[in-house]
Amino acid sequence: SKDASKSMPQMSERRVEAVVVTGSRIANVQPNVAPNPYAIPGEPNTEAYPHSTINSVKSVAEQPVSTFAMEVDSASYANSRRLINQGELPGKDEVRVEEFLNYFKYQYQNPSDKNAPFSTNVTVAPSPWNKDKKIVHIGLQGYNKTQSQRPPLNLVLLLDVSGSMSAENKLPLAKKAIRTLLPQLDSRDHVSMVVYAGASGVVLNPTKGNETRDIVCAMENLQAGGSTAGGEGIELAYKLAQQNFQKDGVNRIALLTDGDFNVGVYDPERLKSIIAKKRESGIYLSVFGFGGDNYDDETMQALAQNGNGIAAYVDTLSEARKIFHDDFSTNMFPIANDEIGRAHV
């Protein structure tokens, strides 16, 4: 009814007081008890998300050209899943539809030739809202490089070890995520490790990818503590990546953080400018988010977009395996860099 629809929660509501889920989930309903005046208040929720707007339907007769970015980010899906599992309703800024679509595989036909690295999969179906219209679905599939085909990888792991990363779903989960990555590396690859908190530093100089013990030892000694000077860590990571630059390989920084940069010289525009400039030197920056309450998705998205990398969110060990193991080739090795076919445009 009309009155009933008014009582339904709107997507813009960031938190709901009660959520009842059928099946194996238990209703997240607060008991009817008086608040404890002596209770210690929890940490405030400071999660930040980029503002989103809904694209309107456009007439192709008036606007025949549509431009869109070919991104493979999937952070919004995993983060929304985390919120739902906590009994919370994701807000409209937290749900980016294209990242929900990116999360799944669609069994599109794989390109057979790396020199023609995209296949086009087109289907036509009747429109569900107008029997006189049809809908065209265009799916693009990129070329998947095998382990033997891929180039060497110069990977700098940039880990946030500030106090905000102490929770089990932050630095401890980030360490487990890195462990799932290591079996994909070999002697062609080099791994470095930079950490940042109140200050930044190198904890692992360039090390061959098959020297797993050295990499694990450097990582397992890390503990979370202190404030977050993220900008300094990023600049140091770029310096280390440049020192070990692989001309015929892929040079990438992987930032693992909750995005809560809270001390130091942190000018978002300056940081984005630095990253965009470094992008031109052939060094990619990908961002992997962890945790909640202070998760800064807005910063994460801006860094990844300016760094020509991907943005993903890790909420479980299963998701870590998907990103760093199962989709290792997809997430680490690009098949094209801002190419444009001048002869066809």
Q: Residue ranges of each PLM-predicted region?
A:
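Short, surface-exposed loop/turn motifs at beta-strand boundaries within globular domains
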Residues: 14, 61-63, 73, 131, ...
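Exposed acidic/Ser/Thr-rich ligand/metal-binding surfaces
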Residues: 4-5, 114, 118-339, 344
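N-terminal secretion/transport leader regions
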Residues: 16-25, 35-37, 304, 345
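Negatively charged
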Residues: 36-89
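Extended, small/polar residue-biased N-terminal targeting/export presequences
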Residues: 82-85, 89-135
